[in-house]
Amino acid sequence: MKMTDIQIAKENLKGHSICLCKDGAYFTDDGRGISPMLRFIGEGRDLVGCSAADIIVGKAAAMLFVKAGIREVYGEVTSQAGYD
């Protein structure tokens, strides 16, 4: 059975702070906090439609995911503000 993008992102999160996946291709980062997302957005990466797995999803991270067009998010820890 083929893994979904969110399953691939979750599987490859181990040892990293964030993993983004789209159409089976994934990339990871080990930066702290929201710095990986800020860097990805600043680099002009096309994140629309990606699935994301992150260690901690708070309000700021959730807002960046929405701004970037992330399709779905898995957080090992998610704050109520991040969920809302």
Task: Identify the function of each model-found stretch.
Residues 2-76, 81-84:
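Conserved mixed alpha/beta catalytic, RNA-binding, or beta-rich assembly cores of soluble enzyme
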